[in-house]
Amino acid sequence: MDRHDFLWLSAVLLSGCGGRKYIRLPAGSIVLALGDSLTAGVGAPRHADYPSRLAEMTGLQVINGGVSGNTSGQALARLPALLRQNPKLVIISIGGNDFLQRQPESATRENIGKMIEMVQAASIPVVLVAVPRPTVGALLGMPSDHPLYGDLAKRYNVLLLKGVWAEILGDERLKSDAVHANAEGYRRFAEKMADFLRKQGII
């Protein structure tokens, strides 16, 4: 293991105020975006998905690990192979299909928890993305995050990007259908993610 790799294995350090401080990602660093159709970019033209837009905005090499229709269990099964690409950051945005299929919440929590554990075992920082839950409010155009994401972020002490998918999917101008963004919606998500990573000192 060389010095550069050692620094990345020690990327998350305690700051003086008791929070978490992240070593800045060099340009061209590999980032894995793991998810479902919202990551794959369903509802927008090719290369208008949020990982592509995030790469354009940041200079990072963002791998689109989104597969339309994937549940948390299916994404978990794909994760080991994706981690072999040696990402320096993993973004996890998954769970919408679990909710639509009414899978047990306990199973979704367990699967996402296992993903986080797997990534943390490789000493890679995680950004967990909150996904809206199917409620009457969502049907009326006012989606809100499922609380399990906040719970998991606290349990595993990982970064949480909250409210962004809910905001986008609650705006008719930013979505292609009830559960997918359009090109502008994915651009907006990438912009919010880039701003979030800058505020955390990651880029």
Short names for language-model regions:
Residues 3-20:
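N-terminal export signals
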Residues 4, 18, 28-30, 58, ...:
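Catalytic-site microenvironment of enzymes
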Residues 18-86:
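Serine-esterase "nucleophile elbow" of acetyl-processing enzymes
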Residues 56-57, 76-203:
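Alpha-helical cap/lid subdomain in secreted, periplasmic
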